[in-house]
């Protein structure tokens, strides 16, 4: 139960998830599935059917109930890939985020290798096109340390794309891409996801989104994320209960983050862009040697002022 609403199954395409508070309730639902499969001559694949036992934090499990589907035994797992996201019995996002980070690094290397001869601006566009999906990230705990490791890998990729020093200031790295820093982007996606749930045509999803805004629901992972975003970025928590506030909240968030991002000398940043274009061969400047260009780039990227 979530509040007073019982949610016992979810479905996406041919993927079905059953949720039950007791073993007996699970057996009842599995029987319904088996009877349906028999009636309509379909089969559930036992090799792709797994069981996960979620327990109260810190409490050991003494007994694992036995379940069957279509006469086949269902195995237990501690984690499982579901629609591209790893679900863990400990209700932790760590494995999912680390897995996404590892996949991201592989994608980045492929893009930078395949498009190595293109200029930095074009490679940045391709990097976002091929590597920035982050499907399922709206469900992550935004306070997990592993997210910072993911963001660090993304900043490293941008530094490689623009061929700037490894200690280039983070705000300059983000400004070069003319996008929000990755962490801010993940927060922005969570905001849009929340309002998307509020206006969903599915009444279950709408009810869940509204429940997250009450005191009890705010202790859930998504509720904690919304409270964290409000605290971190000075947003009104009550605004997340009103669908009419969507544009206002996202506009304020993005404007606030861009103002913080460009808190450096923009004239020096424009010089940096020109030097990087010269380095890429897009611009030509006869009176500066390659060493001069590198020196200017290094000075602007790492200057403390």
Where are these regions (language model features)?
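Structural motif
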Residues: 2-4, 69, 82
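Short helix/loop segment immediately N-terminal to the Walker
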Residues: 1-6, 119
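Charged boundary/loop elements
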Residues: 47, 137, 141-142, 196-305
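Non-catalytic, peripheral interaction segments enriched in hydrophobic/basic residues
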Residues: 13-14, 45-50, 54-57, 81-208
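Short, flexible turn/loop "capping" segments at secondary-structure junctions
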Residues: 8-11, 75-79
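Catalytic palm subdomain of template-directed nucleic-acid polymerases
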Residues: 7-39, 56-58, 88-93
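Secondary-structure transition/capping motifs at alpha-helix termini
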Residues: 36-43, 164
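Short, conserved micro-motifs composed of acidic
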Residues: 43-78
């Amino acid at each position: 139960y979530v509040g007073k609403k019982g949610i016992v199954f979810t479905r996406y395409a041919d993927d079905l998830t059953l949720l039950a508070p007791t073993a007996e309730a699970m057996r009842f639902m599995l029987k319904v599935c088996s009877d349906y499969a028999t009636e309509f001559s379909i089969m559930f694949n036992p090799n792709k059917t797994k069981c996960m036992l979620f327990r109260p934090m810190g409490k050991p499990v003494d007994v694992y109930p036995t379940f069957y589907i279509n006469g086949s035994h269902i195995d237990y797992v501690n984690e499982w890939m579901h629609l591209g996201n790893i679900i863990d019995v400990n209700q932790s996002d760590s494995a999912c985020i680390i897995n996404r980070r590892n996949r991201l690094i592989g994608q980045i290397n492929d893009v930078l290798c395949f498009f190595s001869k293109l200029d930095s601006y074009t490679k940045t566009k391709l990097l976002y096109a091929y590597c920035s999906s982050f499907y399922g990230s709206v469900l992550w705990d935004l306070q997990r340390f592993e997210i910072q490791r993911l963001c660090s890998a993304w900043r490293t990729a941008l530094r490689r794309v623009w061929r700037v020093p490894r200690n280039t200031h983070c705000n300059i790295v983000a400004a070069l891409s003319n996008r929000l820093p990755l962490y801010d982007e993940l927060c922005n996606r969570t905001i849009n996801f929340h309002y998307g749930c509020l206006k969903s045509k599915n009444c279950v999803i709408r009810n869940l989104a509204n429940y997250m805004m009450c005191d009890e629901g705010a202790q859930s992972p998504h509720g904690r994320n919304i409270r964290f975003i409000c605290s971190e970025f000075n947003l009104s928590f009550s605004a997340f209960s009103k669908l009419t506030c969507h544009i206002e909240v996202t506009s304020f968030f993005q404007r606030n983050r861009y103002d913080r991002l460009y808190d450096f000398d923009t004239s020096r940043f424009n010089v940096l862009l020109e030097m990087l274009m010269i380095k890429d061969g897009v611009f030509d400047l006869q009176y500066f040697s390659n060493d001069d260009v590198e020196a200017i780039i290094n000075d602007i990227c790492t200057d403390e002022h």
